[in-house]
Amino acid sequence: MNKKSKIIVFASFYPKKEKNNEVKEIILTMIDPTRLEKGNEIYNFYEVKNDNDKEISFHLFEIYKDSAALDFHRNTSHYKNYRSKITNLLDRPIEVKVLTSINSI
């Protein structure tokens, strides 16, 4: 991975039943401090409701200036704190995809 290329991350969270609000609140605490990080360009939070709103998933779309900015993010106290709190509230591990641009603007 080129250190100077923008890094695009798509992370998906699937809460255990009855843990939707807790997961949502933990992720919400990440937004402001992450957006203040020098290398963060975008940190957007989304929700998907399926099966008559019974199944909910949350998704983060993140863009970092370069891989050093992503490394910095993953070493912050707010990142480490959120990871320690959220893991046991999820039905399965966080799905993290690092996207590589083929053709983008």
Segments and roles (model prediction):
Residues 1-5, 44-55, 84-105:
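Glycine-rich beta-strand-turn "strand-cap" elements at beta-sheet edges
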Residues 33-41, 63-97:
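An amphipathic, aromatic/His-enriched active-site/gating alpha helix that lines ligand/cofactor pockets
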Residues 30:
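Aromatic/hydrophobic pocket-lining residues that form π-stacking "cages" and hydrophobic walls in ligand
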Residues 7-14, 44-74:
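Short, well-ordered beta-strand segments in beta-rich or mixed alpha/beta enzyme
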Residues 15-20:
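Short, surface-exposed ligand-recognition loops at beta-strand->loop->(often short) alpha-helix junctions
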